[in-house]
């Protein structure tokens, strides 16, 4: 009972210390509001409002059909330019695409001469250039074929292919980006808060005060784990409800309660990692460097940004020992596919085991550090 009281008391002390740290509070608010919204809305897997200009030297029915086939939301309304303006507009970056339809284009098409349309692409805009190039080729080819046939061509297939996209019918990138941003920020902040709390006490000299109190290293460490974990847990819940569900209108298919249980288990592991890193670093700059070395692989190789099946087998095996891999798996299953506990229980077991291992390793390292300071 005394141990529990000490853990609660020390945890409340950590929360009061965090409330006085304006920079850390600003980071928490930013990470679960602006960062989530921008990650969801800025990243897009499709072409969106790409600027295009067309120099129509033919002024024929076919060239008009091609020009009118570029419309929102994929392209802005095509600008009508002169051929002499094309190079200057590309150099200034005004348009991502400029197209030159040559004279007598329609006549040559009808005569079967295979005339060429020049398409200039500003490759410095990588996303638009890569996607727009294929979009424009398909649009121009489709309009030319339609014009030649005088009617829309419907290819009759020997079988009916009925394609249905499950869990994200419109293939909306925002649904994926918002949830993955929350997952990544949960990992990042849980490590930062616990590690920074330990380093802050060392820099301010308050860790020496704890050494003369009747508390154990386990109680000190556990207080930091539950207090900083609680902050991240509540912040992630608020972000999921207010930013993702309410503001972005992203549907949550599964149980939020079950997801938050998974968050709590993941926080148990990641906060322990933060404590371990805090014992290794001697200052906040060193801790920041360690963060880069640890956080990037955890986020990049957990299966959220890149499919795990696309990674080398030895990388997959290594990442199975990391909590983020199983957290991403259960989060996607619950929030996207509406999975219940009977489906995600293996991930829960993995998180408990991995969290226990990291907590034990961090506790041993923390005790060694405390003994060296005593």
Please place each PLM-identified region on the residue numbering.
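Short, membrane-interfacial amphipathic segments enriched in basic
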Residues: 1-11, 76, 314-325, 374
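Extracytoplasmic/periplasmic domains immediately adjacent to an N-terminal transmembrane anchor
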Residues: 1-175, 343, 368
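Junction motif at the cytosolic side of a transmembrane helix
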Residues: 2, 197, 276, 335, ...
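Alpha-helical transmembrane segments and their short interhelical loops
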Residues: 33-37, 217-291, 296, 342-348, ...
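Transmembrane helix segments
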Residues: 37-47, 281-321
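Membrane-interfacial helix-loop-helix junctions in multi-pass membrane proteins
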Residues: 167-171, 303-358
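Long, hydrophobic alpha-helical segments
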Residues: 174, 178-195
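Transmembrane helix boundary and interhelical loop/hinge segments in multi-pass membrane proteins
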Residues: 191-213, 225, 370
């Amino acid at each position: 009972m005394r141990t529990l009281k000490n853990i609660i008391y020390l945890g409340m002390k950590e929360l009061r210390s965090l409330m006085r740290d304006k920079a850390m509070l600003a980071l928490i608010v930013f990470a679960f509001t602006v960062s989530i919204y921008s990650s969801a809305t800025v990243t897009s897997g499709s072409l969106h409002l790409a600027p295009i200009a067309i120099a129509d030297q033919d002024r024929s029915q076919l060239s008009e059909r091609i020009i009118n086939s570029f419309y929102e939301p994929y392209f802005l309304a095509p600008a009508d330019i002169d051929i002499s303006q094309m190079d200057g507009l590309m150099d200034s970056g005004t348009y991502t695409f400029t197209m030159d339809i040559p004279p007598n284009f329609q006549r040559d098409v009808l005569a079967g001469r295979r005339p060429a349309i020049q398409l200039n692409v500003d490759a410095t805009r990588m996303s638009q250039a890569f996607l727009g190039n294929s979009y424009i080729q398909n649009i121009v080819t489709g309009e030319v074929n339609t014009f030649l046939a005088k009617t829309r061509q419907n290819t009759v297939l020997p079988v009916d292919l009925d394609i249905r996209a499950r869990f994200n019918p419109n293939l909306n990138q925002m649904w994926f980006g918002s949830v993955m941003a929350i997952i990544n920020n949960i990992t990042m902040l849980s490590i930062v808060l616990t590690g920074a709390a330990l380093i802050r006490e060392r820099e301010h000299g308050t860790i020496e005060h704890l050494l003369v109190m009747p508390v154990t290293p386990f109680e000190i460490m556990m207080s930091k784990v539950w207090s900083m974990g609680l902050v991240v847990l509540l912040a992630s819940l608020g972000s999921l409800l207010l930013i993702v569900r309410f503001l972005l209108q992203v549907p949550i298919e599964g149980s939020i309660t079950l997801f938050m249980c998974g968050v709590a288990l993941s926080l148990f592991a990641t906060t322990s990692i933060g404590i371990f890193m805090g014992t290794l670093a001697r200052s906040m700059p060193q801790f920041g460097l360690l963060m880069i070395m640890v956080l990037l692989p955890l986020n990049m190789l957990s299966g959220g940004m890149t499919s795990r099946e696309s990674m080398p087998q030895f990388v997959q095996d290594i990442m199975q020992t990391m909590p983020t891999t199983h957290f991403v798996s259960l989060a996607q299953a619950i929030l996207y596919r509406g999975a219940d506990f009977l489906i995600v229980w293996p991930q829960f077991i993995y998180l408990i085991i991995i969290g226990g291992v990291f907590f034990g390793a961090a506790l041993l390292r923390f005790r060694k550090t405390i003994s060296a300071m005593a």
